[in-house]
Amino acid sequence: MNTWNYEMRTEKDSKEFNTWNPVAYLEEYFPRDVDIEPVVKLIAEEGIKRLRPNAKAIDVGCGPTVCYWSALASHVQELYLSDYLTINLAQIAKWLNRESDMYDWSYYTDMMLKFEGLENPSQQDIIKREMLSRSKIKGFMRCDISLENPVGVSQRGEYDCVLSVCCADSITYNKEDWRKYMKNIFSLLKPDGVFLGSSMRNCTHYKIGDISYPAANVNEDDFKELMSDYGFKDIRIDVVYESRPIVDSQIRKTEDLRGEYDQVLLIAGTLQG
């Protein structure tokens, strides 16, 4: 079994995100009492339809989050994780190594198994599925989506699938920057490669506790234009409500989930060969 070590280097991390706390982010945005995680559902649906079993995939801007790339694991042969903040990759390494202070993703693993067709997953089913996810990880990379080659020129056009969830839209207030960042992310795809992703909808900022971070204020029209111009086909863009606490699931449709946003975009497309 691999032991993943990711040095928590901070000297190169973004000054704009020097207050970033990956655990606080996970606790606020990935509680263990939500009714549905729509991005996990998207990946389960589109992964089986669009990807071949030997696919090579990368999660760009993975953050400290496990459930998205883990949902992709059953549909690909190799998975690479990349992020700008090294503390995020260090947080994922804790989960890969099963360290005592790792974040518990079993609630979301149970959810993804149900999306994959297993009606009542057992604890053993969850453990087995998480073992599968761990086995697909082949490496970490540090990425910078402001660069034309976010993970290096050698990786350009190397991937059958690129996953990027709330990455480009969550680091800038500027829509032109967002377009540039998304094109840089798309450049990692092979011809006929599949993009899967999500974005906050009509969001100008988001918060973790009392700390505010930038958002690009994009919507479905922005993505349709961008992806069509870049050469994607079979584009899917859904507008859905963000995950909601179970106790509130019946009333959240008429109330804001948060002050910043309450809807997300689910995005899938295949790059024309």
Predicted segments — roles?
Residues 97-151:
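S-adenosyl-L-methionine
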Residues 173, 203-225:
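Acceptor-substrate binding/catalytic loop of class I
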Residues 197-199:
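Acidic carboxylate diad motif detector
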Residues 230-236, 240, 245-273:
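Core SAM-dependent methyltransferase catalytic element
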Residues 52-65, 78-83:
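Conserved class I S-adenosyl-L-methionine
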